[in-house]
Each structure stands twice: as structure tokens, then as C-alpha cells.
């Protein structure tokens, strides 16, 4: 009988991606199968996130529950990974004696060897090092789980915003080689994946090495991926305004596979607070990016992250944020009350905005974003939207569920044969968290793009050398 693995994941999409790779590794090298029930597992893995307040205590509460399982089964192996493990590994081991292994985001590829060591009776293992891109060299071939897939193109961040722990828990920016990224996506496309979401803490800082020792920019990578046969929808997250350059905006103008939706975190609309956060840009520069984007792609929708109650945030600072929200007309946001992260520069600042003020401002901001999102949804009434069908509807398994380019869930009635493909639906009703549609046509009635080689795409974009001679670089 195969052994069983249970993984509990907290945090961002990068953590979700990492957890899927842990499962693949444990299956490929150890023969473990996933289980949803911790009580059935031989190995329990907790993939942690350090972004939210009291992240460390949340870890210990979960480990306390798992300790009871280990008391009943001394052979049970418990591991802690992710950003809290990277930041607080020794503290976890000292406080939770039930933990057998602790590993960071950059060492999850060593998981099978760590398990071998524990199964052989070895001592607890702690490995929270930063071995650069080695992690991706050791991962097994990707396995598709539905028509949409995440693909990590880089790790870490080198921006060192004053509030953020990512550079300390995931290391500085390291890009995967171009060929590795393209191969993984091509393998997923062969398994039926139609939509790819490129992942990284700061994807637009991507600088991947090519086979001929050149550097591939993020804009060039987008065009390469869009040219892969079978990939008809392309997303990416997350990006930083200071590296959202014109060449990336140009991709929106000529690459229909790239969706009309962008998550571009701004955090605050106050120049004073942005400076305190060490974001490297002002509010007007952010708005300039959005204006140029909407010139290239008029129907693009934008979402953002906001931190409420950063140290020193005055009422005027908050009003500046609300003014930015009004000017940009965000479609969605991830908004958080500020809480100091240990070891960050901002943690040395006085947390002088009261909790009641933070909660009040958060409610005001979220209400405004919700109103704007509902207005966008209502504008879709009567329109025909192309959606990627993900599977049965959550509330009614006799119906289907898909997503628009702007990530809105649409429920509709149609033949299950359409799961995994694109369909056109007319939007007939709008709800707070979803849309209702009527099926119009399936993929066999659509005029989808013809297959193109990557060189066909890139050859359209000229480059001038230092002498001013125009070259076309395939």
C-alpha cells in the first residue's frame, strides 16, 4: 500500500505552486499519494506564509493539532516549509519538538532526501538556504490539473520595500533560463492546458538566460509563450510598477493571447507613504503606466494591493489613496491592515495608526472597490464573453463553470464535453461574486488563431544595434 501525504498551504499563488511541486516530488521519488485527511497521512507538510500578522503563532497552533496525531503515531513525519520556515526555522524547531524537517521555498526540491534521512532514523533536518535556481533543475515533469496552470519563471525579489519580508525569506531575484520555462509550458500544453499564469514575486524583472548566452526580457518571454501551440490565454502575477516598461505595454497592443487584466500593486496613493515604503515611484508615475496601458488595450481592467494604516498614514494620505482608486477605477483589490513584519525596516517605525482607524479605512476602501467592480460586471450584461471552462459549477454540478479574461466566474448550462475548452456565453445576470451566462457557441465554431512559431512573432519586432543598423532578431 502506498504511503500518503497531506499538505496544508497558506499564502500566495507561489506557495500553491510550490505545494503542487512538493506533491509531484513525493510521488515521483517516494511514491506518496495525496490525501485530504491529515489523520490518514504518513507525512504532514505545512507550507507557510509570513505576510499576515501573527503568522508564527498560526504555525504553532497548527503544529499543536498535528502533535496530537504524532502522539498516536510516532512514525508520523511532520515538516514545515515556506516563508515562516525560512525566517523562523530555529524558533520552530526549539518550540515544536514534533517537527522533523524544516525547509525554505528554495530547498523544497531536496524534500525526498530529507524524508529519507528521517525515515532512516536521522535527526531533525533544517535546510533554509538559498541555492539559487537549483530548485527547478530537480523538479519532475509538470502534471496538468485542469485547463489552467501556474508556471514559476523566477524566484525572490530585489526591491526591498520597507514593509516586505520576501527578499529575506525567498532571496533576491533569480530568473529561470528561457528554455526551461518554454519546455515546462510546452509539456503542459501537450497535456491539454490552454491558459498559463506566469508566476514570480516581480515577474517583469525577468531576465532569463538563453541557449546562446543572451538575455531574454519579460516582454520577449510573453511573446514566446503566446506563440506556443495550444496556449490561447496568458496571464502573469505579480509585477512592480518601476519595471513595467514600454516594451511590456507594447505586448498588450499586438498579442491577443495576453488577457485584458493586470494585477499591478501600488500599495498607497500617497507619495509620502510610497516614499516611506521605498516603492521607488510616485502616484503620478503609476497613473502614467495605466494611461499608456489603456491606450494600448482600451478594455483592460486593473487590480492592486493596498496596505492600510502604514506607520504615519494621515487622513490626507488615505484620501490620496482614495483619489488614486477613483482615478484608476480598479476592478479588484487585495487590501490589508498594516502589521509589522519582523526584520523589515518598517518594523522600526512607530505603528501610530490605531486599529479602529485602520479598520474604518479598510472598510471604506473595500466598499469603493466593490462598487467599481459591480459597475464593471453590470457593463457586461448582454455582452458575449469568451470563457475557459474549468469544470462543474460549485453550487450546481449539473451546470458548468468558467472564467472570463478578467477572472470573473460564469455559471451556465452546457454539455460537459466543453470542459477544458473555450466557449462563448452571453452574460444574462450579475451577482456579487459571479455571473450567469447562456451558452452561445463552442470552440469548434470559433475562428481561433493559427499556429505560429516563436520566431514568427519576434521577427515583427525590430532592434537597432549601437550603429543604428536595424536587425530582426528571431
From Swiss-Prot:
UniProt: [4Fe-4S] cluster 2 binding residues: 157, 161, 164
Family: Belongs to the methylthiotransferase family. MiaB subfamily.
All copies of domain TRAM, residue ranges: 378-441
Subunit structure: Monomer.
GO terms of molecular function: 4 iron, 4 sulfur cluster binding; metal ion binding; N6-isopentenyladenosine methylthiotransferase activity
Metal-binding keyword on record: yes
Localization terms from the record: Cytoplasm
Listed EC numbers: 2.8.4.3
Radical SAM core domain sequence ranges: 143-375
Organism of this sequence: Shewanella woodyi (strain ATCC 51908 / MS32)
Cofactor: [4Fe-4S] cluster
Every MTTase N-terminal domain range: 3-120
Co-factor binding comment: Binds 2 [4Fe-4S] clusters. One cluster is coordinated with 3 cysteines and an exchangeable S-adenosyl-L-methionine.
Reaction(s) catalysed (UniProt annotation): N(6)-dimethylallyladenosine(37) in tRNA + (sulfur carrier)-SH + AH2 + 2 S-adenosyl-L-methionine = 2-methylsulfanyl-N(6)-dimethylallyladenosine(37) in tRNA + (sulfur carrier)-H + 5'-deoxyadenosine + L-methionine + A + S-adenosyl-L-homocysteine + 2 H(+)
Function recorded in the entry: Catalyzes the methylthiolation of N6-(dimethylallyl)adenosine (i(6)A), leading to the formation of 2-methylthio-N6-(dimethylallyl)adenosine (ms(2)i(6)A) at position 37 in tRNAs that read codons beginning with uridine.
Gene Ontology CC entries for this record: cytosol
Keywords noted in UniProt: 4Fe-4S, Cytoplasm, Iron, Iron-sulfur, Metal-binding, S-adenosyl-L-methionine, Transferase, tRNA processing
Binding locations of [4Fe-4S] cluster 1: 12, 49, 83
InterPro entries given in the database record: Elp3/MiaA/NifB-like_rSAM (IPR006638), Methylthiotransferase (IPR005839), Methylthiotransferase_CS (IPR020612), Methylthiotransferase_N (IPR013848), Methylthiotransferase_N_sf (IPR038135), MiaB_methiolase (IPR006463), rSAM (IPR007197), rSAM_horseshoe (IPR023404)
Protein known as: tRNA-2-methylthio-N(6)-dimethylallyladenosine synthase
A Pfam family the protein falls into: TRAM
Amino acid at each position: 500500500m502506498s504511503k500518503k501525504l497531506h499538505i496544508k498551504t497558506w499564502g500566495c499563488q507561489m506557495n500553491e505552486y510550490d505545494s503542487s511541486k512538493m506533491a509531484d516530488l513525493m510521488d515521483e521519488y517516494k511514491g506518496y499519494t495525496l490525501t485530504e485527511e491529515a489523520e490518514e497521512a504518513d507525512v504532514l507538510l505545512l507550507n507557510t506564509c509570513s505576510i499576515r500578522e501573527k503568522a508564527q503563532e498560526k504555525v504553532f497552533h497548527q503544529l499543536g493539532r498535528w502533535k496530537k496525531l504524532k502522539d498516536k503515531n510516532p512514525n508520523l513525519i511532520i515538516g514545515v516549509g515556506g516563508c515562516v520556515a525560512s525566517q523562523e526555522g530555529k524558533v520552530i524547531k526549539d518550540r515544536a519538538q514534533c517537527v522533523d524537517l524544516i525547509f525554505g521555498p528554495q530547498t523544497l526540491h531536496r524534500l525526498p532526501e530529507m524524508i529519507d534521512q528521517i525515515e532512516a532514523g536521522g535527526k531533525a533536518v533544517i535546510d533554509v538556504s538559498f541555492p539559487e535556481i537549483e530548485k527547478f533543475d530537480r523538479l519532475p515533469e509538470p502534471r496538468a490539473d485542469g485547463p489552467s496552470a501556474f508556471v514559476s519563471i523566477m524566484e525572490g525579489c530585489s526591491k526591498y520595500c520597507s514593509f516586505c519580508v520576501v527578499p529575506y525569506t525567498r532571496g533576491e531575484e533569480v530568473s529561470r533560463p528561457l528554455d526551461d520555462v518554454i519546455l515546462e509550458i510546452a509539456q503542459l500544453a501537450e497535456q491539454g492546458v490552454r491558459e498559463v499564469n506566469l508566476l514570480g514575486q516581480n515577474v517583469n524583472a525577468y531576465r532569463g538566460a538563453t541557449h546562446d548566452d543572451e538575455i531574454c526580457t519579460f516582454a520577449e518571454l510573453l511573446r514566446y509563450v503566446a506563440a506556443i501551440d495550444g496556449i490561447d490565454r496568458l496571464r502573469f502575477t505579480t509585477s512592480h510598477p518601476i519595471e513595467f516598461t514600454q516594451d511590456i505595454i507594447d505586448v498588450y497592443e499586438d498579442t491577443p493571447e495576453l488577457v485584458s487584466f493586470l494585477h499591478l500593486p501600488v500599495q498607497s496613493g500617497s507619495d509620502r507613504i510610497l516614499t516611506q515604503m521605498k516603492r521607488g515611484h510616485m502616484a503620478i508615475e503609476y497613473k502614467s503606466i495605466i494611461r499608456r496601458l489603456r491606450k494600448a488595450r482600451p478594455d483592460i481592467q486593473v487590480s492592486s494591493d493596498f496596505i492600510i494604516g502604514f506607520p504615519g498614514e494621515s487622513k490626507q494620505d488615505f484620501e490620496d489613496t482614495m483619489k488614486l482608486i477613483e482615478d484608476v477605477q480598479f476592478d479588484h483589490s487585495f487590501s490589508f491592515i498594516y502589521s509589522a513584519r519582523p526584520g523589515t525596516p518598517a518594523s522600526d517605525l512607530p505603528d501610530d495608526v490605531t486599529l479602529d482607524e485602520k479598520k474604518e479605512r479598510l472598510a471604506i476602501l473595500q466598499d469603493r472597490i466593490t462598487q467599481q467592480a459591480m459597475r464593471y460586471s453590470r457593463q457586461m450584461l448582454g455582452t458575449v464573453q469568451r470563457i475557459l471552462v474549468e469544470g462543474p459549477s460549485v453550487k450546481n454540478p449539473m451546470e458548468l463553470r468558467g472564467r472570463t479574461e478578467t477572472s470573473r466566474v460564469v455559471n451556465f448550462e452546457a454539455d460537459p464535453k466543453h470542459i477544458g475548452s473555450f466557449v462563448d456565453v452571453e452574460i444574462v445576470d450579475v451577482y456579487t461574486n459571479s455571473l450567469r451566462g447562456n451558452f452561445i457557441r463552442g470552440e469548434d465554431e470559433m475562428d481561433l488563431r493559427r499556429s505560429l512559431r516563436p520566431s514568427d512573432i519576434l521577427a515583427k519586432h525590430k532592434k537597432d544595434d549601437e550603429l543604428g543598423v536595424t536587425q530582426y532578431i528571431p
